[in-house]
Amino acid sequence: MKQVLRVLILLLVRIAGLPGARAAERQARAPLPGAPRILLVRPDHLGDLVLTTPVLYALKAQMPDAHVTMMVGPWSSEVVARHPAIDRLLTCPFPGFRRGKQGLIAPYILLVSIAQQLQRGQYDLAINLRPDFWWGAALLYLARIPRRVGYAIEPGTPFLTHALPFSAPEHATLSALR
């Protein structure tokens, strides 16, 4: 039942988000602005978030004028709360990473709610840093972010504009730096 519900909701997300995503993707054909607004999404717990921090330095080295927002779970926000490469920190109680029971529909209600909030951020680029996080890819799609980067792992791939190949045996830090 849960699997069928997810497939149906993923289909609805694609259909509902299509007009906004198409309009956002047309914007993506233009070069990034000089000071792009970038959103990084990493829902994981402490260890995986620590392994992602080299990405922050690499991103700021490549785009020093970028405004970088990072969205993490409240359980790991202290890891990057004072990181010099982050201009803004957002927290989200990502489904699948929270402990305790949650309703069958609750993750999808949260998806729409957070996507609406992210639309106000007017991001030029978003990077989903967790390889198998379809919810994050769908979030970026519904938020109408023009350039959505993540790993080519189903069922999240259709929500991305740039799907990167994923190599499972690769160390998490190296994978994130790609």
Regions of interest found by a model, annotated:
Residues M1-R178:
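Catalytic machinery of carbohydrate-active enzymes
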